[in-house]
Amino acid sequence: SESLFDQEADGFERYYSRQADRKKEKKPAAHQLRGNRRELGSLQTTEAEIPVEELRHQAKTYGVSMTVFLTAVYLCAIHRTMTRRQESKPVVLMVPVNLRNFFPTNTMLNFFNWIEPGYHFQGGKEEFTDVVQKVNACFKEELTAEKMEKRMNDYFALQVHPILKFAPLELKNVCINIGARTAESDVTAIFSNMGIIRMPESYETYIRY
């Protein structure tokens, strides 16, 4: 059974291992989506329903998972809005990864990282199959315990940095905002496939489908 301590434990802290500094690969700037700025705190949500069986069948015809298939579809959809000039930069998606699949934990806290599949469209010569294959190769290469551990360590190292750890909250917020803006230049959009969500039976009577 899960204890309250297990549920409140920090998965990052449990699996963090200090490593020697390694040079980070410099990532190229990604294509940025433009739109009308909305009021602070407001969101625009678009909902759609897709028959899962049909989606699964389409993914299967390419020999990939539904997540890989949908990631490729999203990349191509963004490309359709781009001009030839904008094709000078790749389209890159941030795809969250549930670290519980690699590092067992009962924590109820956030415990995820991400990978960044992308595609550099050039002149519209690419077929959808090319994009699917590139995305699938990225998933296979990045979704390993070794790669996830490195990303996790890089992320948590900031939290335990001796300067930031004891810095005032105001300074931390400034550093976080600067880091967020820098990270945004490497990514075009975020895509998250939550997959099948199973709730405890005791919650079922309170959930409406």
Where are these predicted regions, by residue range?
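Acyl-thioester-dependent acyl-group transfer interface
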Residues: 1, 47, 56, 79-209
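Short amphipathic alpha-helices and their capping loops
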Residues: 1-44
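Generic intrinsically disordered, low-complexity segments enriched for polar/acidic and small residues
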Residues: 9-13, 66, 203-206
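Gly/Ser/Thr-rich phosphate-binding loops and adjoining beta-strand/alpha-helix segments
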Residues: 31-100
